[in-house]
């Protein structure tokens, strides 16, 4: 019953340093965009070393890294489909 669906599912990429680099870059970009666009980034619980994360609070960092992972998944799948990864 599910076999035809498995046939059209894209192949996943094995984890490698290239894949890790793409994910790191996407997260850094998302943190930079979040730092520039979030109105009150330091609200909520504080991080142990807030200066390392640009003074962002826990909620802002969690939100930006979540967005970074979503962007990273799309970038990794797109680059894998093109044969770059």
From Swiss-Prot:
Keyword line: Membrane, Photosynthesis, Photosystem I, Thylakoid, Transmembrane, Transmembrane helix
Name of this protein: Photosystem I reaction center subunit PsaK
Membrane topology classification: Multi-pass membrane protein
Family of the protein in this entry: Belongs to the PsaG/PsaK family.
PROSITE patterns: PHOTOSYSTEM_I_PSAGK
Gene: psaK
Transmembrane segments: 12-34, 54-76
GO biological process, one term: photosynthesis
Organism: Parasynechococcus marenigrum (strain WH8102)
């Amino acid at each position: 019953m599910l076999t035809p669906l498995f046939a059209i599912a894209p192949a996943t990429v094995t984890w490698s340093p290239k894949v890790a680099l793409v994910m790191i870059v996407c997260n850094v970009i998302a943190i930079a965009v979040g730092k520039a666009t979030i109105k009150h980034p330091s609200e909520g619980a504080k991080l142990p070393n807030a200066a390392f994360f640009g003074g962002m609070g826990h909620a802002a960092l969690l939100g930006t890294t979540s967005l970074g992972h979503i962007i990273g998944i799309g970038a990794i799948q797109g680059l894998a489909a093109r044969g770059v990864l």
